[in-house]
Each structure stands twice: as C-alpha cells, then as structure tokens.
C-alpha cells in the first residue's frame, strides 16, 4: 500500500493519493479450488483534493476512485459427481467514480455564533460511468443479469445545522 498526503505546500489545499495492491486466493465454502474472492480487486487507487476558498467561505472537493475488475463466478453443483464446478467466470469491468462537492460555511469566522450551518451540494459519479458490481444468475445458471446501482449518478443538496457546538469540520470531512 502507498499513501501520500499534503496539507502544507499550498495554502488551504489538502490532497492525498492512495494505492493498494491485493493478490489473494481462498479455498472457501463451495469454491471448487482456491480462487480470488469476488470482493477482492487486485488494484485500487484514489485521489482526493479539497480546497477551502476563504473569501467565499466555501470548501470545494473532488475525489476519484478506481478499482480494477473483480472476478465473478457462477459455481454450480453437479449431482452426478457430487462436486461443484464453474458454470461461468470472468471479471467485471473496472470501477471508476469521480465525485464533486461544495460546502458553504456562512458562520465560519463569526464570533459568538450559536448556530453552525453547512450547506452542501454533492454529486457522485459526475461522469456517469457505468458501474457493474457483479452478476446474478438464474437458478439453472442460463441467464445472468448485472448488479448495478439504481442510478448511475447521485446528487445531494442539503444542509447540516448544529446548535451550540461547531461541527462544521465534521460535516465537511464526512461528506466526501
């Protein structure tokens, strides 16, 4: 695993880059042999950039996430041999997601503030990438359907308001 974060070289800019490599196999439950589980992506990476624009009291955030294609399997039972076998297998397409958010903090810097609102606009999967998480198979294994999110893109517009305790950093850091 690799991780790099920098908050010091550019004023009000925080960014990090991470990369993970995973090479694993398991002999588990009904697996015919030791195989890579369907939840294990060999390569994952992310890039996150957060910039606070003091003049307009706004935090601008971008994040990009990547995961290489994970394996999928349709493991069937053969009653004639009393063994399991691969009826279908392969790799799902690589996962890509670019997200963006704006956080407006009108109370930041105000003395004796009693209310701390954070107004948020957040868009996940800005480029509308098709994200396939796996496949479902019919009982007889003859048909497979993609497991996809109900919507390719998600837009959130909202406000987080705390009274008495300043939780603006919490709202910003948990938004990405």
Stretches found by the model and what they are:
Residues 1-3, 47-49, 99-107, 159-160:
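Short, well-ordered amphipathic alpha-helices
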Residues 39-45, 94-98, 115-117, 151-155:
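Residues that define the transmembrane beta-barrel architecture of outer-membrane proteins
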Residues 6, 38, 51, 89-91, ...:
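Residues embedded in well-ordered secondary-structure elements
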Residues 59-99, 103-105, 109:
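Extracytoplasmic gating/loop element in the C-terminal half of outer-membrane beta-barrel translocons
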Residues 1-74:
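Gram-negative outer-membrane beta-barrel transporters
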Residues 22-30, 76-84, 135-140:
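Flexible, solvent-exposed coil segments and beta strand-coil junctions
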